Amino acid sequence: MSDRLAVLPQYLIPKQALTVLAGKLASAKAGGLTTSVIRWFVRRYNVNMTEAANPDIASYKSFNEFFTRPLKDGARPAADADFLCPVDGAISQYGTIDRDQIFQAKGHSYSTTALVGGDRKLAEQFENGSFATLYLSPRDYHRIHMPCDGKLTRMIYVPGALFSVNPTTARGVPGLFARNERVICVFESEFGSFVLTLVGATIVGSMATVWHGTINPPRPGVIREWRYDEQNIRLKKGQEMGRFLLGSTVVMLFPKNTLAFNPDWSPSRAIRMGEQMGSNAN
């Protein structure tokens, strides 16, 4: 079956309604039922609870509380590197931005302008720069951390579709990451500006950042923007910056001649938060 045919049902199902329902169920505190669901999830996806700060499944009051569980101290030691991997998961794609085109999968690419919600001036900063698309599976730790020190300057919420995000949809849905709902976080660093984009998906109930809290819902259907130039919000390398309540994908953009990727990286490779993502290219 072709990838386009495989994703055809996703054009037909009520993705928004399913996502709203999933968000409500995931936040519900249903006692023993919640514990049973979490226990099933841990078995189904082989979740390693020994890494969790709290490994006691029965102590989680809601599925969201379990899903966004913190790790115990020392579970992800930080590499001695200029840029750290911000998440647990797998590498979808990474490499050089071709003028303004980001490679998604064979036969598919999308523009940096589309990714950041149409802001051409912002997108131009990453012309011929570097990108990394990192996928978080259901079993993974779902908090996102800083790849390097950064000062927050902007956050942009872009409404969009809610296709599921996986290798099949990456191959079968053109412009997937620039079509789905997303939150774009813009930082300044000693290496220049960089972008961390949190991409939503079917049943991703919401996305949150440490400085704002929950961003969605609500889902107003229009682009929203927050500016932080005067608030001096600074986050250290390795510090938590956000989380998925049910998870998806992170897309990062860096300027030209900034990032030299870890030579051990390759598409589909498993990654862990805190490992070396790359070094300063200058």
Curated annotation (Swiss-Prot):
Subcellular location: Cell membrane
Keywords (A to Z) from UniProt: Cell membrane, Decarboxylase, Lipid biosynthesis, Lipid metabolism, Lyase, Membrane, Phospholipid biosynthesis, Phospholipid metabolism, Pyruvate, Zymogen
EC number(s) on file: 4.1.1.65
Annotated InterPro entries: PS_Dcarbxylase, PSD-B, PSD_type1_pro
Catalytic residues as annotated in Swiss-Prot or TrEMBL: D88, H145, S248
Pathway linked to the protein: Phospholipid metabolism; phosphatidylethanolamine biosynthesis; phosphatidylethanolamine from CDP-diacylglycerol: step 2/2
Cofactor note: Binds 1 pyruvoyl group covalently per subunit.
Function statement: Catalyzes the formation of phosphatidylethanolamine (PtdEtn) from phosphatidylserine (PtdSer).
Pfam family, one: PS_Dcarbxylase
Lineage: Bacteria, Pseudomonadati, Pseudomonadota, Betaproteobacteria, Rhodocyclales
Primary gene name: psd
A Gene Ontology biological process term: phosphatidylethanolamine biosynthetic process
Site (Cleavage (non-hydrolytic)): G247, S248
Topology of this chain in the membrane: Peripheral membrane protein
Catalytic activity: a 1,2-diacyl-sn-glycero-3-phospho-L-serine + H(+) = a 1,2-diacyl-sn-glycero-3-phosphoethanolamine + CO2
Any GO molecular function: phosphatidylserine decarboxylase activity
Transmembrane segments: none
Protein family per UniProt: Belongs to the phosphatidylserine decarboxylase family. PSD-B subfamily. Prokaryotic type I sub-subfamily.
UniProt subunit comment: Heterodimer of a large membrane-associated beta subunit and a small pyruvoyl-containing alpha subunit.
Pyruvic acid (Ser) sites (modified residues): S248
Name assigned to this protein: Phosphatidylserine decarboxylase proenzyme
Post-translational modification (record): Is synthesized initially as an inactive proenzyme. Formation of the active enzyme involves a self-maturation process in which the active site pyruvoyl group is generated from an internal serine residue via an autocatalytic post-translational modification. Two non-identical subunits are generated from the proenzyme in this reaction, and the pyruvate is formed at the N-terminus of the alpha chain, which is derived from the carboxyl end of the proenzyme.
Cofactor dependence: pyruvate
Cellular-component GO terms for this entry: plasma membrane
